[in-house]
Amino acid sequence: MATLLIDNYDSFTYNVYQYLCSQGADVVVYRNDKITVDEIVKLNPVNIVISPGPGHPSHDAGVSRDVISYFAGKLPILGICMGEQCIFEVFGGTVSYAGDILHGKTSTIKHDNRGLFKNVPQDNQVTRYHSLAGMPSTLPEVLEVTATTDDGVIMGVRHKKYTVEGVQFHPESILCEHGHTMISNFLSLRGGNWDENPAAGVLAQKVPAAATEKAAQEASPAISTPPTCSTILSRIYAQRVKDVQAAKEVPGQSQADLQKLLNLHIAPPLRDVVNRLKESSPALMAEVKRASPSKGNIDITVNAAEQALQYALAGASVISVLTEPKWFRGSLNDLRQVREACPLLPNRPCILRKTFLLDTYQILEARLYGADTVLLIVAMMSDEDLRELYQYSVSLGMEPLVEVNNAEEMARANAVGAKLIGVNNRGLHSFDVDMETTSRLAEMVPEGTILCALSGISTRADVETYVSQGVHGLLVGEALMRAWNLKEFVAELLGYKKKDPVPHTPVSRQVQVKICGISSVEAAVEAATAGADLVGLIFAEKSKRQVTVAKAREIVDALHKLPTRSSQLPVKSQKSIDWFDVQTEMVEQRVPWRPLVVGVFVNQSIEYMSQVAVEAGLDLIQLHGTESAEIARFLPVPVIKAFHMDASSFHAGQIPYVTQPGNNQLLLLDAKVPSLPMDRQGGLGQKFDWTIAQDIVNVKRPGCSKEQTFPVILAGGLDPSNISEAIQQVRPWAVDVSSGVETDGKKDLKKIRAFVEKAKSINLQ
């Protein structure tokens, strides 16, 4: 009589075969779809082994489940990995995600020293290749747990009456300790019941009444069923408790320290998440998600900030950032980077910190790292904790998203007064998805509360169903992360009407012209009447073109008295989303009326520049020295920041520094004269390297088309003789000239007019 090995199409099947043979078994192997129960009956095997295999035992195990059902109680059966899962399901249990995806990893197990584990030491190292496991909460009455990992994952089960055993690990692996002993223990079994195998020690043994407490303690350790065997949620909870405690113990990161940082205004400004969601219907809540307990790695290499920016540009109202490190591969740094990537958008989405919150410390962390809202999972906390965390979040200005999964949790969320409730279609105890969960709970949401559907959403049909039931917000993660064309997928998901493709028609434009170094009313008026858009007045102390505040006021007044050049502001056909595009458009909307006056300063105090701007009536300030661009935040008018580029030392790595948004509204590129100090740069006729300007003009920006160039003001060595070539080669937003329209150090009115006319004669597309 032979041992029958059912092959579930697994690469380890013949490792199992080898181990069985090494212990003296005569083994025959059949694949799970190449033999029937009737044929097995005719084989008359002495015992049966169900091999590991890919997939789920419900639909990928072939004849394995039928074999267990028929032969249990007739002969010994051993299930390995998927084989064990088949045993678990055949007798009424549920197999679902185990909380980790393990491939060739070892774990320490505790076991009951009986049956398969007789004479196997405790803390035995076993090898695991699985992502599924039997759910402890569904353990069938007829089975008992024989082994678990340190964190409670079931590693072995046994039928209480029949000689049926299963192990979730691979005893045939070379890394598994005492695998041969386990196989030998199985092969020693005879018959279909444990009472036929007293040597296995499975059935309860009668002990003398005089047994001492010490003897009882020395007995084989029992493997308990739930709650000792944990769900995924409880395992995550336990890990987060450790993580929070560790974070609090980092010097400078205590709760008191974080509160000090908040008081110092380290946290960025907030947006009201409820109002932001109301701006769109339905509102997309897009999730940055590298991995998950149920799916494993989704996109482990994704850059959180880049992904978030793509979500924002596709129309997301909220961006959810997973910051849990172990199961979701996220971090607080992801949250910070996402927040820093989005604030320069005209209508940025709100940022949600999505993690397993259990302490006010984590909410304070979220606020400091840039979140506008946080996730509170009702299933993870008592009513008292839920109320405390909810009220604390609201006290920081963040209305939390309160997550529920059933009617009892919905009632608890309503009781705390949640204004934003999300129904998670994924059960956190098993991580199984039930898309009807939101539908069942929708009617329990009070009027005025925003309802969101979380998890499992991937099609337009899903969205239509939920919207018809009153759902307003839709949290989508994996489907977005895997989308080939994100914008098209979002448009389809939200039901945006497809527009007929319109051929790209280049729009011609003229460059803006700035005449700098103006020191007389006559020159200013000539520049204005010639068509200049900006007039520069220099206040730098060491400049030969320096003007007084009184002279500047005189020039400004003269320009204000000129007739307006247009009675109609330009209308943009496309909404701008880039910081610099928005700023240049604001300037363009003002210059048709009259030229704007720019005050040029070199390393002068904020107080002085502000005073001059107010007294002289300046429209813009140009920082032409080594000032930090951050100074722009403290000045009363928009700022042009000049960057003096040394062609001999320029590197592409400097471009992100030059094009950094959020401070100066405009940027100017000028040549650097290495022999002169920084407070003497500019206005010298030194030609700027146009190839450097081209590199900056052609820099790619998120959300901008290939045709959109980066708006720069080109300066350095320009004059009427080369301005046409410069514009055609560089394609700048504006050009700046000073010495190039002078004769003998004074502004030449003819050159001014010639320069403006030539610059304006070129139409760029």
Curated annotation (Swiss-Prot):
GO function terms (MF aspect): anthranilate synthase activity; indole-3-glycerol-phosphate synthase activity; phosphoribosylanthranilate isomerase activity
The protein's role, per its UniProt record: Trifunctional enzyme bearing the Gln amidotransferase (GATase) domain of anthranilate synthase, indole-glycerolphosphate synthase, and phosphoribosylanthranilate isomerase activities.
Protein name per the record: Multifunctional tryptophan biosynthesis protein
GO biological process: one example: L-tryptophan biosynthetic process
Species whose genome carries this gene: Phycomyces blakesleeanus
Gene transcribed to yield this protein: trp1
Binding site for L-glutamine: G53, P54, G55, Q85, S131, L132
CDD domains named among the record's database cross-references: GATase1_Anthranilate_Synthase, IGPS, PRAI
E.C. designation(s): 4.1.3.27, 4.1.1.48, 5.3.1.24
InterPro entries (UniProt xref): Aldolase_TIM, Anth_synth/Amidotransfase, Anthranilate_synth_II, Class_I_gatase-like, GATASE, Indole-3-glycerol_P_synth_dom, Indole-3-GlycerolPSynthase_CS, PRAI_dom
Reaction(s) this enzyme catalyzes, per UniProt: N-(5-phospho-beta-D-ribosyl)anthranilate = 1-(2-carboxyphenylamino)-1-deoxy-D-ribulose 5-phosphate; 1-(2-carboxyphenylamino)-1-deoxy-D-ribulose 5-phosphate + H(+) = (1S,2R)-1-C-(indol-3-yl)glycerol 3-phosphate + CO2 + H2O; chorismate + L-glutamine = anthranilate + pyruvate + L-glutamate + H(+)
Keywords from the named record: Amino-acid biosynthesis, Aromatic amino acid biosynthesis, Decarboxylase, Glutamine amidotransferase, Isomerase, Lyase, Multifunctional enzyme, Tryptophan biosynthesis
Domain Glutamine amidotransferase type-1 residues, every copy: 2-196
PROSITE patterns, per database record: GATASE_TYPE_1, IGPS
Sequence segments annotated as region (N-(5'-phosphoribosyl)anthranilate isomerase): 512-765
Indole-3-glycerol phosphate synthase, as annotated region: 231-494
Pathway this chain belongs to: Amino-acid biosynthesis; L-tryptophan biosynthesis; L-tryptophan from chorismate: step 1/5; Amino-acid biosynthesis; L-tryptophan biosynthesis; L-tryptophan from chorismate: step 3/5; Amino-acid biosynthesis; L-tryptophan biosynthesis; L-tryptophan from chorismate: step 4/5
GO CC list: cytosol
Catalytic residues (UniProt): C81 (nucleophile), H170 (for gatase activity), E172 (for gatase activity)
HAMAP family associated with the record: PRAI
